[in-house]
Structures are given as structure tokens and as C-alpha cells.
A protein has these predicted regions:
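Catalytic-loop of the protein kinase fold
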Residues: 199-201, 206
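Juxta-kinase regulatory segment immediately upstream of eukaryotic protein kinase catalytic domains
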Residues: 1-22
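ATP-binding pocket architecture of kinase catalytic cores
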Residues: 29-182, 190-198, 214
Length: 344
């Protein structure tokens, strides 16, 4: 996706009023898959690369593509020296170019899309996963009252979020899956209605992080889904990777040892040390079921849009094909003893 030249000129003018000066001779380069919030590489007059992130063009669903939300989160995290890009300027007046946008620092490093890290040696694989766990624990350890974010501090995020996803996909009786429905109704009664709140990333995974040359997590990207909620949301989304077979989405499965990766138990221990709290295994088991149902609903949503002929990501077919495997993992995990959920 290209950035319209007239829009770019308006952006340059706006940023100059914010004391941010763009190199007009460097054409914006589209980066990322462009399916969510269009993202461009730009350069300032001191020859430093920066990132411009905008809302998509056209009508947007209420509450979707909140780049202003991302900006405020990055601003709060920058004050904590957290591993995330520093934001510089936000334009929340959509009348300027028809949509909101902001600029943040460009973080150089590697983005890994294969969770098995085939190009890394054993030591580096451990460093990368340990760093991911520590950074996630650090995020969840922050006092949300000190972050000054305009987010609601309501308890019961997991119940609300799961109900939202489930109802969105299975509102039509003819499309309901009896096996999924049984698990959904059961787990909904097990999810917490209250408890501690943390700042959640909402989509914390390997390919949403930038890894430095010393194999540390240098920056966490894509904060569009961030909110206040139970930290179990983010940590369970990581732990299920050891339950999902390798080759299916972000799965590590039973190949973790063969590929020299740390275990889920290792990851959880590193996370707990950084978070400075122990995670209850029964609660984590329930959270893993939550994450698997939610992931299944996301995949079914992609399938629905695909069959309706609506625009979806380039890897839509791959994600659609993954749905049966995720359902199988979900059903097996639901019947598994909580202590066996944590692969070690």
C-alpha cells in the first residue's frame, strides 16, 4: 500500500509544527503486511529512520484501529523505559488526512516468524525465549495506576472478551459447534470475575517483537489490542504454543526438545521471576482453554470473511486450514490434567 503524496505533504506539515522534521526526498516505504494499520518507514532530516502508522482508509468499525490508543500506551511505557518504540507525535484529528496517525521510533533488529528459530544456535534460542518471558513479566508487573492510561479498569476481562468472540462467530444457531459450545460454557464459569489487573499486550508473540544482535527482546510492537485485564491472557497465549503442533501457526508442540528450545515450564519460570508472582496452575490451565477457544474463533472469523469474499491477509488460507488442528488441541487440553498443561 502506498501513501498518497498529498496526504504525505499534510503529514509533513503537521509534524513540523510538532518540531519533527521529515526528509521530503525519502519516499515512505510500506512495511508489515498492511492488513491492520498501514505502516510506513520514513526518515527525518537528520537521516534517522522513523515509523509512521495510520488508520486504514474508509469506514472503520467502532473502536477498531485505535492508533491513538497505541500511541498512549507507547508513551506510558517509554516513561518506564520498557522495551517498546518511543512515540513522537500523534494527530488525533482525522479531518487532516481522513484518519488518525502517529510517528514512533524505528527499532532495528530481527523479527522472527518461525517459533523454532532454525537459524539460531541452542544458546541463542534460550536467550531469545528467556528475554521474551522476562519482558512479558516486566510488563505485567507495572502498577496500572501509575501508567495514566485512559483505559477502563473493569474486572472480568477474560469472561467479557471470550463471550464477545464466541457470540460473534457462533451467534447463528446453524453455525454452532456442539463440542466447542460445551467447552465454552464450562470454561466461562471457571474464568475469574475479579483479581489483579495488568496492562495486557493482547497479541504478545515472537513475530511482534524485535530481537537485538545480543538476542534480547529490544522492542514489543503492535499494541492495538492492549487493555487492562488479567495477566493470564498474555502468558497463556504463549504457553499454548507448546501445545500446538509445530507447523501449525506459532506452534512448537512436541518438537521443542528436538529443536533445542526451552520448555513451557522454563518459560513460565522465567516469567514468574520477572513478574515477581507465582502463577496458579489451575488458573493457567483455564486461561489456556480461553486462549485456544479465542484463537479458534479468530480462525473461523477469517474463514467466514474469506468465503464472503472480503479482504483478508495473504496467509488466510493457511490460517483457515489450521482451525481443525486448533480445535483438536483445545479438546485434548480440556481433558488434560492441569499439571500436564505445562509442557516440561
Amino acid at each position: 500500500m502506498d501513501l498518497d503524496q498529498s496526504d504525505f505533504e499534510k503529514i509533513i506539515e503537521f509534524l513540523s509544527l510538532e518540531n519533527f522534521f521529515v526528509d521530503k526526498n525519502f519516499n515512505p516505504k510500506s512495511i508489515g503486511d498492511g492488513q491492520s494499520n498501514p505502516t510506513f518507514l520514513i526518515r527525518d532530516t537528520e537521516n534517522n529512520f522513523k515509523v509512521l502508522r495510520t488508520q486504514p482508509i474508509g469506514d472503520l468499525a467502532r473502536g477498531a484501529h485505535r492508533v491513538d490508543r497505541e500511541y498512549f500506551v507507547l508513551k506510558a511505557l517509554s516513561s518506564k523505559s520498557f522495551e517498546a518504540p518511543e512515540p513522537f507525535a500523534l494527530c488525533d484529528n482525522s479531518e487532516l488526512i481522513g484518519r488518525m496517525f502517529y510517528v514512533m521510533n524505528f527499532e532495528e533488529g530481527d523479527i522472527n516468524f518461525d517459533p523454532l528459530l532454525p537459524n539460531e544456535n541452542l544458546e541463542n534460542k534460550k536467550k531469545i525465549y528467556k528475554s521474551l518471558a522476562e519482558v512479558l513479566g516486566k510488563l505485567h508487573s507495572y502498577d496500572i495506576n501509575e501508567l495514566n492510561l485512559p483505559f477502563k479498569k473493569n474486572h472480568g476481562f477474560m469472561k467479557r472478551n471470550l463471550s464477545l468472540w464466541y457470540d460473534q462467530i457462533f451467534h447463528d444457531e446453524s453455525k454452532k459447534d456442539k463440542e466447542i459450545e460445551k467447552i465454552y460454557k464450562n470454561i466461562l464459569t471457571e474464568l475469574p470475575s475479579d483479581g489483579g489487573l495488568s496492562l495486557l499486550h493482547g497479541d504478545f508473540k515472537l513475530d511482534n517483537t524485535v530481537i537485538s544482535d545480543d538476542k534480547k527482546c529490544k522492542a514489543v510492537l503492535d499494541w492495538e489490542l492492549s487493555s487492562f485485564g488479567e495477566p493470564l491472557v498474555d502468558i497463556s497465549f504463549q504457553i499454548i504454543n507448546w501445545l500446538i503442533p509445530s507447523g501449525v501457526l506459532y506452534g512448537i508442540g512436541g518438537d521443542w526438545k528436538e529443536n533445542g528450545l526451552p520448555s513451557a515450564s522454563d518459560f513460565l519460570l522465567w516469567y514468574e521471576k520477572s513478574y515477581k508472582e507465582e502463577v496458579d496452575i489451575q488458573s493457567l490451565r483455564n486461561a489456556c482453554i480461553f486462549s485456544l477457544i479465542k484463537l479458534f474463533c479468530i480462525l473461523k472469523g477469517i474463514e467466514n470473511r474469506f468465503h464472503q469474499g472480503n479482504a483478508v491477509s495473504k496467509d488466510a488460507e493457511e490460517k483457515i486450514l489450521a482451525a481443525p488442528a486448533i480445535k483438536e488441541v483445545l479438546m485434548n487440553s480440556f481433558e488434560t490434567n492441569p499439571n500436564d498443561i505445562i509442557v516440561s
